[in-house]
Design a protein with these regions (language model features):
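Short glycine-rich substrate-engagement loop in P-loop NTPases that contacts/grips substrate
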Residues: 56-85
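Pre-Walker A adenine-sensing motif
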Residues: 2-18
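Accessory nucleic acid-recognition modules appended to NTPase machines
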Residues: 54, 184-344
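Hydrophobic positions on the alpha1 helix immediately C-terminal to the Walker A/P-loop
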Residues: 36, 40
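Conserved lysine of the Walker
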Residues: 33
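Interdomain motor-coupling "hinge/lid" segment immediately C-terminal to the ATP-binding subdomain
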Residues: 121-123, 128-230, 263
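Hydrophobic anchor at the beta1->P-loop junction of P-loop NTPases
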Residues: 25
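Conserved catalytic segments around the Walker B and adjacent sensor/switch elements
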Residues: 45-61
């Protein structure tokens, strides 16, 4: 399959080359972390042909013998394989497979001739222990599935972007899923189901000691079906228990934590716009990919279009390097508060359609209560781009391609 060059992520890696930081590439399995390392390797060689590069994927059969050894043996192997008189670029893929990998990273970090890049599929490898060892020494680059423009590079359909967007929401942006969707949607669907099962078996069940597959799947389904709705462990436990699926708050909280640690879901906390503070309750969770979400639920997304649009917008805001929260202003909710690194803040509402006057009034109402003059945007699937009392209304496809 033709590769999509992930320019934004590659640009970050290029900017950080030679810095005294461990470049930590995170994201769900099969999302393209290894491919990104390969692309960075190629870009590095193109820029510095004589560069010394050592690349190890601990998931590959040829290197699994290392995963079975202690961290010190792996360290000795790596140091013995590099050129001691020059800078070496060391790429370690799926580092969490090494026991006590944090000690391995600490040892390699202080080596004067190593510029270190690592990937991992589970957030526990950014745990408190590693954070303590490497405080201020790491830079995380979290990889998300293909954006809509990246999807179009592979799937085609630029001449009919609206139709392509429907397919994008259906199949999502996992690289291989996009490839399979070109053959048939059901192939993409089956592939994504296998991805989820693999993540559950390899990254979640054994690692976290999940004893009830059924209870776990109940929570996953609830979270996937509730994307864009406020939830809490207590609320989920209560609803499931009332439907005959008994589970306690503690188990639900644990399960949700495993899903975010595995990058299957992302949490959006609530933010009090007037009080300028984060709130501790009723956060929302969004799936890492709409196609994966559809595959988990085992259904096509008809009837869920509003929440799916919201999910797409949330992920795109993250791609654009924003901090993203759910806004609260008085008794009203703003779908997203997005703040860029330079402090630029936007307030965003997302709706499938605002052709109904009542729907339009409901979507605009929270903006009227916001006391500042930051940009306010209403994103819809309607074919109408306009300004309404200082609120910019824009079509979802136009926004994604802008």
């Amino acid at each position: 399959m033709e590769q999509v060059v992930r320019h934004m992520y590659l640009g970050t890696l290029s900017d950080l080359r030679g810095s005294n930081l461990i470049k930590v590439i995170t994201g769900a399995r099969r999302i393209g972390k290894s491919t990104l390392l390969e692309q960075h390797h190629a870009a590095l060689k193109a820029k510095i042909p004589e560069a010394s590069v050592l690349s190890i994927n601990f998931d590959e059969p040829g290197y699994r013998f290392l995963a079975e050894k202690g961290w010190k043996e792996v360290y000795d192997f790596i140091v013995g394989a590099i050129r001691p008189q020059e800078m070496n670029y060391v790429f370690l893929d799926e580092i969490q497979n090494i026991r006590q990998f944090e000690k391995l990273l600490e040892g390699l970090f202080v080596h004067p001739k190593i510029d270190l890049y690592v990937t991992g599929s589970n957030a526990c490898f950014l745990s408190s222990e590693l954070a303590t060892l490497l405080t201020g020494r790491q830079f995380e680059i979290n990889i998300l599935p293909f954006s809509f423009p990246e999807y179009l590079e592979i799937a085609g359909g630029k001449e009919n972007a609206d139709r392509a967007f429907v397919n994008y929401v259906m199949a999502g942006g996992f690289p291989e899923a996009v490839k399979f969707a070109k053959v048939g949607e059901h192939y993409s669907f089956q592939y994504l189901q296998s991805v989820y099962k693999s993540i559950y078996q390899n990254d979640i069940k054994a690692r976290y000691g999940i004893h009830s597959d059924i209870s776990y799947q109940d929570v996953v389904n609830f979270l996937a079906d509730s994307a864009g709705s406020p939830v809490s462990p207590g609320n989920i436990a209560r609803v499931l228990t009332n439907s005959g699926k008994k589970i306690d708050n503690k188990s639900v909280a644990k399960y949700i934590s495993t899903l975010t640690d595995s990058y299957l879901f992302y949490r959006a906390a609530r933010y009090d716009i007037k009080g300028k503070q984060l709130l501790a309750t009723q956060e929302k969770y969004y799936a890492v990919d709409t196609g994966l979400r559809n595959a988990i639920l085992g259904k096509e997304p008809y009837g869920d279009s509003g929440h799916l649009l919201e999910n797409v917008v949330f992920l795109e805001l993250l791609r654009r390097k924003n901090q993203v929260w759910i806004g609260k202003v008085g008794t009203c909710e703003v779908d997203f508060v997005a703040r860029a690194a330079d402090g630029d803040t936007k307030y965003i509402q997302v709706s499938q359609s605002v052709k109904n006057p009542e729907t339009l009034a409901r979507e605009l109402a929270p903006f009227d209560k916001i006391p500042d003059h930051n940009e306010k945007i209403l994103i819809t699937a309607d074919y109408e781009n306009c300004s309404r009392n200082g609120v910019r209304q824009i079509n979802i496809v136009d926004w994604l391609l802008s």
